Amino acid sequence: MAKILYGNEVALKIKEDLNLRIGKLKEKNIIPKLAILRMGNKPDDIAYERSIIKSCEKLNIETKVEELNEDILEEDFLKLMESLNNEKETHGILVFRPYPKHLNENIINSSIALNKDVDCMHPLNLERIFEGDLNGFMPCTPEAVIEILKYYDIDLKGKNIVIINRSMVVGKPLSMMVLSHNATVTICHSKTIDLPSITKRADIVVTAIGKAKLIKEEYFNEDSIVIDVSINVDENGKLCGDVDFENVKEKVGAITPVPKGVGSVTTTLLLKHIVDAAERNS
């Protein structure tokens, strides 16, 4: 049976360090604070918002939610962003995506202060990653993949890595991050021909396509390390990933579960970035 790469163990280790750092900030009368901007009332957004708030509360990180109409004018959004950028007590800003179609994504992302951009949405922060500089904020989900591999002592140097996702949220930044660790990377997507023949040759496969249990054992070899980023709902209403876990777990070397995998680390890294920002801005 495959080694199960539990993300909650990784998250727990990060939180232990955060507790110490937050305690030191409190001694200076600094309370880390996150501003969340949500446009509309999509159930997925509201659920994610509640999850973030709950996680923040456990570590004594303050949150402020700005509930905005989906038809908000770009001018009004930018005024709000300017106000949050100038608030000394607000250390991190997170804007839920995707944005309403009438808003210019590049303009919105560029409006976030670089030192408060805790999910690396600003083009200049992303550009830094594409230049190989991993010292600042990184997108939380790709960073979670790296942290899980690091925790379980999986060296990326020389590894062949296949990423099934080409978005700016996961696939593209993650590809640059693993390149910085001297891996060889292949990006696949919905138009890739004969995907199993590509993934089967890889040492590590990262999938983030959002299709419940689509990926079966024929995509992997017996030594494959499988990182399942997606959180889907199966036909029985249960959370699952892109990979059919029960079908695959006996056939590969290691695999992350869903839940208790990448998602738990992603949220914890958001908290870490808020604390990082509070320390830098203090």
Curated annotation (Swiss-Prot):
NADP(+) binds at residues 165-167, 190, 231. InterPro entries: Aminoacid_DH-like_N_sf, NAD(P)-bd_dom_sf, THF_DH/CycHdrlase, THF_DH/CycHdrlase_cat_dom, THF_DH/CycHdrlase_NAD-bd_dom. One of its GO terms (molecular function) is methenyltetrahydrofolate cyclohydrolase activity. Keywords: Amino-acid biosynthesis, Histidine biosynthesis, Hydrolase, Methionine biosynthesis, Multifunctional enzyme, NADP, One-carbon metabolism, Oxidoreductase, Purine biosynthesis. Its EC number is 1.5.1.5, 3.5.4.9. It comes from the Bacteria. One of its GO terms (biological process) is methionine biosynthetic process. Pfam families: THF_DHG_CYH (PF00763), THF_DHG_CYH_C (PF02882). One of its GO terms (cellular component) is cytosol. It catalyses: (6R)-5,10-methylene-5,6,7,8-tetrahydrofolate + NADP(+) = (6R)-5,10-methenyltetrahydrofolate + NADPH; (6R)-5,10-methenyltetrahydrofolate + H2O = (6R)-10-formyltetrahydrofolate + H(+). Pathway: One-carbon metabolism; tetrahydrofolate interconversion. HAMAP family: THF_DHG_CYH. Catalyzes the oxidation of 5,10-methylenetetrahydrofolate to 5,10-methenyltetrahydrofolate and then the hydrolysis of 5,10-methenyltetrahydrofolate to 10-formyltetrahydrofolate. Homodimer. PANTHER family: C-1-TETRAHYDROFOLATE SYNTHASE, CYTOPLASMIC (PTHR48099:SF5), C-1-TETRAHYDROFOLATE SYNTHASE, CYTOPLASMIC-RELATED (PTHR48099). This is Bifunctional protein FolD. It comes from Clostridium botulinum (strain 657 / Type Ba4). The lineage of its organism: Bacteria, Bacillati, Bacillota, Clostridia, Eubacteriales.
